[in-house]
Amino acid sequence: MAKIALKVDVDTLRGTKEGVPNLARTLERFGLKATFLFSLGPDHTGWALKRVFKPGFLKKVSRTSVVEHYGIKTLLYGVLLPGPDIGKQAATQMRAIDAAGHETGIHTWDHVAWQDAVRNRDPQWTKAQMQKSWDRFVEIFGHPPVTYGAAGWQMNEAAFEQLDQWGIKYSSDGRAQPNLIPYRFELHSGKAKHVQYPTTLPTFDELIGIDDADEFGAVKKLLEITQSNPNDQVFTLHAELEGQKLLPAFEQLLAGWLNQGHDLVTMGELHRSWEATKQLDKIAVQPVTWGEIPNRSGELILQVG
């Protein structure tokens, strides 16, 4: 059937130290590899409490138990507790993923700072944040990252330009409707060199609580989308969710996709499969576009058309 790329966003210290090893064990049992995108600097998850004033945020929180998934301690980082340095405290868990043969890349330096601010920050701030994450990644892994995936699907033009300057060939920084269509951005500086593979499938936290669905209801919905569907997809999961309380549901989802005949791959494997078609020079080019998607608060990078 199709290829479904497994992209793991790792946002917090707890997610890195607990969720990541859990996911690694599950993937090993299924004989699968995934792309793990790490937050490499301070964990300021508590700063996200100010999102309570954003439309839709309280509705999301009421559907998915933030305290249950993230833990009280994590929610106090940056508020009543100092934000721990994820890259320094969880480098061992990160290296284990690399050593196991999974693909590794950059998610962000400071997740909450990036997600809440980057859209309106200047190039100097943007590139300083990105350089910190690059330097830390190389320090931890001993090699440069091959891919990137924006925190909260938030970017700006300077960030996309930085990806090209780094030589990143493929990235996943936005959202799209189901059924993957790779594309490039038209920036003020010209057409981006890297290819975008947006997340095409809804995430667990966007499905749980809708029409009273629990996590297994979310699995059913995802499998309905991919049943007899020959189109490639990108699925984003989170170490804090699927790597912890939602792990049994994620295991059911993996089994379901394999039973449907899909090939579960890394972002790199997905990119190479599209490279092999010799069509990437002909893919669509679009301006950086913002929009909303169902059951997630706020605007994010969105593929149009």
Located regions from the model:
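Short, glycine-/Ser/Thr-/acidic-enriched flexible segments
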Residues: 202, 240-242
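Positively charged, amphipathic and often flexible ligand-engagement surfaces
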Residues: 196-210
